[in-house]
């Protein structure tokens, strides 16, 4: 099974070697047929502490690194 890759915005970089990334998804509400936005926050591994708040990054699923962390930052978008 291929690893999932998600795109989001870094909302916290206070932890050592970890960033918190907010990933937003959009979908049509089943009853109202209105576009709804929902977001979820993921902890991702950042080995070199190079990503800062506001950066748009891609994260990739990986083996669990800690209790809450099973994603790693792959790259940043320009």
Swiss-Prot record:
Family note: Belongs to the universal ribosomal protein uS17 family.
HAMAP family recorded: Ribosomal_uS17_B (MF_01345_B)
Chain segments annotated as coiled-coil in the UniProt record: none
Membrane-crossing residue ranges in chain numbering: none
Keyword Transmembrane helix: no
Record GO cellular component, one term: cytosolic small ribosomal subunit
Domain of life: Bacteria
Subunit structure: Part of the 30S ribosomal subunit.
Family matches, as CDD domains: Ribosomal_uS17
Record keywords: Ribonucleoprotein, Ribosomal protein, RNA-binding, rRNA-binding
Gene (name only): rpsQ
GO-annotated molecular function: rRNA binding; structural constituent of ribosome
Free-text function comment from the UniProt entry: One of the primary rRNA binding proteins, it binds specifically to the 5'-end of 16S ribosomal RNA.
GO terms under biological process: translation
UniProt xrefs under InterPro entries: NA-bd_OB-fold, Ribosomal_uS17, Ribosomal_uS17_bact/chlr
Name assigned to this protein: Small ribosomal subunit protein uS17
Cross-referenced PANTHER family: 40S RIBOSOMAL PROTEIN S11 FAMILY MEMBER (PTHR10744), SMALL RIBOSOMAL SUBUNIT PROTEIN US17M (PTHR10744:SF1)
